[in-house]
Amino acid sequence: SEMCIRDRDKYPAICGEFVWTGFDYLGEPTPYYTDWPSHSSLFGIIDLAGLPKDRYYLYRSHWNKDEETLHILPHWTWPGREGEVTPIFVYTNYPSAEVFINGKSQGKRTKDLTVTAENSADSASIADFKRQKRYRLMWMDTKYEPGTVKVVAYNDKGEAVAEKEIHTAGKPDHIELVADRNEIKADGKDLSFVTVRVVDKEGNLCP
């Protein structure tokens, strides 16, 4: 995906790119040999329910320049992983960002736009995830501790322009229903999609 995005940025004649697949789909179950009875693929950047996966935000940060993208992954609820290395990735349309765990800076990362398909194909570059550093901001040595992960994004002038937080979830407390619209037509055809979320007492999503 990184090199496809790079080519689109580099060559003005390219007007877009094709992603296999946009959505998960029924049939071609994967992995068919372990998780029986699988009935769906897992290749999409959006799942069967229409919910974006993490990788969706990598594409969104380049396809949608009119809106801010600032996405942290993974979630931060890992009971039993205390003290273990748990990498953090950030997908954003800004060039750099800084991550904080419970208020302590984990350092600032900047996209490396010098990375090309040619200079990132050797075994050392692959082992170092060099190709991914062109469009992803990665903190590979962060250690898990329950609490808050905060990301602060910076523009090309070094100014802090956006921030986002995710929190360790407690025990499931209640179910939250979120509709995608406030009104529907009473014509027997209109509809609304309702997202169901299991959250803790503070409203944090329970993974």
Regions found by a protein language model. Name each.
Residues 1-2, 6-160:
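Extended substrate-binding grooves/exosites of carbohydrate-active enzymes
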Residues 1-3, 174, 204-207:
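Short, intrinsically disordered, charge-balanced linker/junction segments flanking boundaries
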Residues 78-83, 183-192:
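Short, solvent-exposed loop/linker segments at the N-terminal edge
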Residues 85, 146, 172, 189-191:
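A general secondary-structure signal for short beta-strands and their flanking turns/coil
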Residues 88-92, 152-153, 189-206:
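Beta-strand-rich structural segments
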Residues 99-101, 108-109, 161-164, 186-187, ...:
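Extended hydrophobic-aromatic, low-complexity segments
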Residues 158-170:
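Edge beta-strands of extracellular beta-sandwich domains
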Residues 169-187:
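Low-complexity, acidic Ser/Thr/Pro/Gly-rich terminal tails and inter-domain linkers that flank the onset
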